């Protein structure tokens, strides 16, 4: 049969040839150990075949031969940092609602944009509606099922493995919403993964356990006064494993002046109750609030990391932004508030990052709010990078969990661990004995996996954890996502590090804590992993009796 000449081919056939040529060049570059600029290759190859449009990334990904998928997918993945920690994060927003403390303080916090009564009226509290997550939520009319399905589809098209999902429930104080709405919202998150239509939260969780796409955790944003015993019990029922608590400042006068509507004592209580229930605690902190100043800001972060009443597991650092329609905007306009200069802010963030202990993870260093909406505050979109560069100039290292993760190190610095060993760090926090176990390469300061073990205090209110129980609050092996049922020798997930960490945790609980039982706060989708190693479900926890 006579082969068609290039001029006889249709645009669709030319596009297929272009895609094949792009993949061939990628394979050759891989075999020669060369780095390749994908955009340049796409442009050049499309021009070679006389096409005005480049081939889409989605089509290239779909056409990669099976034997080359493992080596080429990391090169084709858009924004590889999204799944570098081993999990695809899906942020969803609940419907707009008023801040719960308006009823007794008379107003919202002075710096807070958004909400039903704000200039950004279709946005949720503390968001403007122009953040990427907000815009996705508005497009889906705040429907939790659609938000989840759309985001997962988007991540898949960009070449990410969406085998494990962690939800972040954003949009103000979720736990202040009516119970009926909360149940509907969480039920739909689980149903979006499992494909089942549930009648209640218990049914949704049951089907989510066996879902192909695993829900390995749910994070809920809340306030210290909505983090009490009944709220924590409800969140455990939902399959929530991590809390993001809005602290903002450890100073009582600042909390009062900014109209927070809760005390610092409430912050300490909420941390204690949350950790004794097994939750991981991430704090939101805001440097550059009114009436603080640089030195006082540094002092509060020193206090925050060193005082056992605080010591969070994670931190989101949100330098104060002046946004129109807020009380702070009026103070700024009248000259009664002035933001730090850009250089002072970079210096401050660098000094804060230098204080972070190796068991704390810094999740974010600034808000996602678009710069045109910011009247005063952060002027750079890459504040974390600038702060890390400043630390490098000063000869200081940032030793938080995220900076040392194996997946992040591989993407940013192309370094891989060489000699891995077990490292143990013990500290006291919120009335309990904490042990941070990790597998690390100490020479290169790379973290492969971690486990947080706590000897619960006697004040724990959950009956499953009473009478001397140790709880594993987090088990995480880092590196790009590897599906739960498979192994990849070049990735660090599913290579046995998780099992080794669990064995050491059980030994410490039995021999050092003197515990007769160990519990795990497990994401709904990872419960079967613990069943395989001898755990059973008791309430929301996976538990095992220790001999």
From Swiss-Prot:
PROSITE patterns: GNAT (PS51186), RADICAL_SAM (PS51918). The modification Phosphotyrosine is found at residues 202, 251. One of its GO terms (biological process) is tRNA wobble uridine modification. Its EC number is 2.3.1.311. InterPro entries: Acyl_CoA_acyltransferase (IPR016181), ELP3 (IPR039661), ELP3-like (IPR034687), ELP3-like_N (IPR056591), Elp3/MiaA/NifB-like_rSAM (IPR006638), GNAT_dom (IPR000182), Radical_SAM_C (IPR032432), rSAM (IPR007197). GO terms for molecular function: 4 iron, 4 sulfur cluster binding; acetyltransferase activity; metal ion binding; phosphorylase kinase regulator activity; tRNA binding; tRNA uridine(34) acetyltransferase activity. Residues 82-372 form the Radical SAM core domain. Keywords: 4Fe-4S, Acyltransferase, Amyotrophic lateral sclerosis, Cytoplasm, Iron, Iron-sulfur, Metal-binding, Methylation, Neurodegeneration, Neurogenesis, Nucleus, Phosphoprotein, RNA-binding, S-adenosyl-L-methionine, Transferase, tRNA processing, tRNA-binding. [4Fe-4S] cluster binds at residues 99, 109, 112. Binds 1 [4Fe-4S] cluster. The cluster is coordinated with 3 cysteines and an exchangeable S-adenosyl-L-methionine. Acetyl-CoA binds at residues 164, 474-477, 497-499, 530. It catalyses: uridine(34) in tRNA + acetyl-CoA + S-adenosyl-L-methionine + H2O = 5-(carboxymethyl)uridine(34) in tRNA + 5'-deoxyadenosine + L-methionine + CoA + 2 H(+). Tyrosine-phosphorylated; phosphorylation on Tyr-202 does not affect elongator complex integrity or ELP3 protein stability. Also serine/threonine-phosphorylated. Gene3D superfamilies: 3.40.630.30. Its main location: cytoplasm. Component of the elongator complex which consists of ELP1, ELP2, ELP3, ELP4, ELP5 and ELP6. ELP1, ELP2 and ELP3 form the elongator core complex. Interacts with alpha-tubulin. Belongs to the ELP3 family. NCBIfam families: ELP3. This is Elongator complex protein 3.
